[in-house]
Amino acid sequence: MATGTQQKENTLLHLFAGGCGGTVGAIFTCPLEVIKTRLQSSRLALRTVYYPQVHLGTISGAGMVRPTSVTPGLLQVLKSILEKEGPKSLFRGLGPNLVGVAPSRAVYFACYSKAKEQFNGIFVPNSNTVHILSAGSAAFVTNTLMNPIWMVKTRMQLERKVRGCKQMNTLQCARRVYQTEGVRGFYRGLTASYAGISETIICFAIYESLKKCLKDAPIVSSTDGAEKSSSGFFGLMAAAAVSKGCASCIAYPHEVIRTRLREEGSKYRSFVQTARLVFREEGYLAFYRGLFAQLIRQIPNTAIVLSTYEFIVYLLGERA
């Protein structure tokens, strides 16, 4: 009986810690997420740059001008949003993000903890296989449950309204999706999210390995008390940042495909069709649009989420 009660308390602890970590991370990094989503969109206004081409051997020696489309950078998109829409637009989609991020992170970490417990009884305890399967299972459940909220968030972030014009709130956006596309509209981009499970698996496999290395490190083992707690906290932040950075670079293209699938009135219909269309029309570099914004958003965000999660579990777990 006591064991069942203890397991229930542990699950609630992981739910609470995961929810707190996700909420803190979402608030701090919202502007970067809006910029990243705009960069990923097919509706991004590309700048036309004219490069002179000199043709040698011509009688006049005159050059020709070749127009080339150039993707605007992070700072240019930021400047455009501030000038045309105002600073408030940098927090577009924060409402559904806050509504979804706490339960999303809570469900994820609870599923991860429970799956890890189950897989430890099947495979070598705390092995990479256990971490990979646990992370993949938790991501699959979370993506399936939370996709409608993330769909609404993306639509709100892609909405462009000039300064002074009224923007849709969360409920209005959800109503519009339902009226124009039905229930299926809320699940657009879900296949891309499933493809993105690879990022989660890579991230947590690296994170757990780094965490184990930090735990076994002689410097950490030799410290005591407050020094150990402080060094451990910053060590976890560094481990989270490195793991997310590596995972993001490897699996980033699915993010661009997911954003395209969630665009309103989109020509994109399925994961494979979208990948082919983007490659044919824009080239392979289009799959990495917004990667820099993603890295400078996700690395600190993941560091905040994971370290807050571990810190709360440590604090409340000790008092329990």
From Swiss-Prot:
Entry-linked Pfam families: Mito_carr
Q: Which reaction does it catalyse?
A: UTP(in) + UDP(out) = UTP(out) + UDP(in); dUTP(out) + UTP(in) = dUTP(in) + UTP(out); 5-methyl-UTP(out) + UTP(in) = 5-methyl-UTP(in) + UTP(out); 5-methyl-UDP(out) + UTP(in) = 5-methyl-UDP(in) + UTP(out)
Q: Which UniProt keywords apply?
A: Membrane, Mitochondrion, Mitochondrion inner membrane, Repeat, Transmembrane, Transmembrane helix, Transport
Q: PROSITE patterns this protein is in?
A: SOLCAR
**Extent of the Solcar repeats:** 9-118, 126-213, 231-315
InterPro entries linked: Mitochondrial_sb/sol_carrier (IPR018108), Mt_carrier_dom_sf (IPR023395), SLC25A33/36-like (IPR049562)
Q: Where are the transmembrane segments?
A: 12-32, 49-65, 121-141, 190-210, 233-253, 298-318
Cite a GO CC annotation: mitochondrial inner membrane
> Which GO annotations describe the biological process of this protein?
cellular response to insulin stimulus; cellular response to insulin-like growth factor stimulus; mitochondria-nucleus signaling pathway; mitochondrial genome maintenance; mitochondrial respiratory chain complex III assembly; mitochondrial transcription; mitochondrion organization; positive regulation of cell growth
Location relative to the cell: Mitochondrion inner membrane
Q: Provide the membrane topology annotation.
A: Multi-pass membrane protein
Q: Could you give a GO molecular-function term held by this entry?
A: pyrimidine nucleotide transmembrane transporter activity
Give the family per the record. Answer: Belongs to the mitochondrial carrier (TC 2.A.29) family.
What is its biological role? Mitochondrial transporter that imports/exports pyrimidine nucleotides into and from mitochondria. Selectively transports uridine, thymidine, guanosine, cytosine and inosine (deoxy)nucleoside di- and triphosphates by an antiport mechanism. May import (deoxy)nucleoside triphosphates in exchange for intramitochondrial (deoxy)nucleoside diphosphates, thus providing precursors necessary for de novo synthesis of mitochondrial DNA and RNA while exporting products of their catabolism.
State what protein this is by name. Answer: Solute carrier family 25 member 33
Q: Which organism is it from?
A: Mus musculus (Mouse)
